[in-house]
Swiss-Prot record:
Keywords: Acyltransferase, Cytoplasm, Iron, Metal-binding, Transferase, tRNA processing. Fe cation binds at residues 117, 121, 308. Belongs to the KAE1 / TsaD family. This is tRNA N6-adenosine threonylcarbamoyltransferase. The gene is tsaD.
């Protein structure tokens, strides 16, 4: 089964083809993928402009599909099914991918299925060289979401904790903006932090000892006050690097301690981390160090699959389609969608 995956939930236009026949050859099933990022488009505004994102998806979907088919050396008539991101995300951006995918499926007379964006992220480490086995705890951490999920099987998701305000990735973006760094903030903060002292400034870790929920709004305020009150924060590169490193350390420390607590609470021994922030090297290294102390392992998606991409949608779509799930012909998107509301796959 060849499944075309379409990802248009925010500011990346991602297309990929998952081919189940490749699994028999010991491969991960990914036949090919293409990804277009709108970073340059939104950088001027310091963040994603929803209307511009939607219009750019419309411009890119057809040429990217042509590029993908050429890369995979197949025709569109060889596509057996289509999976598109149904939510959560920006409603206009979601609708562009959903309408394109559903229309293409209708024209090809193949099934189409809407996929939960965060389920795509959660399953993406299964495409990696060291895939986890169910059950596991998953940390889903991105610009729009931060949550801990106990995954007992595909569709069997229990939310253990989530952010009650800002997502970790959003906090990175806001801190970057305060430091005068360009969009997207996460990679630029991490780059600046490499030259800084992570212990130079003590920043709060809100809700660190209160269950498994997260809160990052207080940390954002603390960074704002630190920048305002610290001489040289606007022109001394070492001071700026120390602030970035201290901020990154505080966020990572919070995420890691919550992950350790979740593993101990559930008794599980595998942690899966996915989403854009999962590419952060300091987070990966700290998780590996701390999880080794409790006899647990950590699994990541390949770096190219940490950001939004079509491969994770194609794979999630394949899993649900081959289990017999079908969607109605109507097109509907869900900008706010709880992952625990997804149906479990029939065993």
């Amino acid at each position: 089964m060849k499944v075309l995956g379409l990802e248009t939930s925010c500011d990346e236009t991602g297309l990929a083809i998952f081919d189940s026949e490749l699994l028999a050859e010991g491969k991960n099933g990914l036949l090919g993928q293409v990804l277009y990022s709108q970073i340059e488009l939104h950088a001027t505004y310091g963040g994603v402009v929803p209307e511009l994102a939607s219009r750019d998806h419309i411009r890119k979907l057809v040429p990217l599909l042509d590029e993908l088919l050429a890369q995979c050396d197949i025709s569109k008539d060889e596509i057996d099914a289509i999976a598109y991101t149904k939510g959560p995300g920006l409603i206009g951006a979601l609708m562009t991918g959903a309408l394109f995918g559903r229309s293409l499926a209708y024209g090809l007379d193949v099934p189409a299925i809407g996929i939960h964006h965060m389920e795509g992220h959660l399953l993406s480490p299964l495409l990696g060289p060291n895939p986890p086995k169910f059950p596991f705890v998953s940390l889903l951490v991105s610009g729009g979401h931060t949550l801990l999920v106990a995954a007992h099987g595909i569709g069997e998701y229990e939310i253990l904790g989530e952010s009650i305000d800002d997502a970790a990735g959003e906090c990175f973006d806001k801190a970057a903006k305060m430091l005068g760094l360009p969009y997207p903030g996460g990679p630029n903060v991490a780059r600046l932090a490499e030259q800084g002292d992570p212990l130079k400034y003590e920043l709060p870790r809100p809700m660190l000892h209160r269950g498994l929920d997260f809160s990052f709004s207080g940390m954002k305020t603390a960074v704002h006050n630190l920048i305002k009150d610290t001489p040289g924060s606007d022109n001394d590169e070492q001071v700026r690097a120390d602030i970035a490193a201290s901020f990154q350390h505080a966020v990572v420390d919070t995420l890691v301690k919550k992950c350790v607590k979740a593993l101990k609470q559930t008794g599980m021994k595998q942690l899966v981390i996915a989403g854009g922030v999962s590419a952060n090297l300091h987070l990966r290294q700290t998780l590996e160090q701390q999880l080794a102390k409790i006899g647990a392992t950590v699994h990541y998606a390949p770096l190219e699959l940490c950001t939004d991409n079509g491969a994770m949608i194609a794979y999630a779509g394949y899993q649900r389609l081959q289990a017999g799930q079908q969607d109605a012909l109507s097109v509907s998107c869900v900008p706010r969608w709880n992952i625990s509301d997804l149906p479990a796959l029939a065993q």
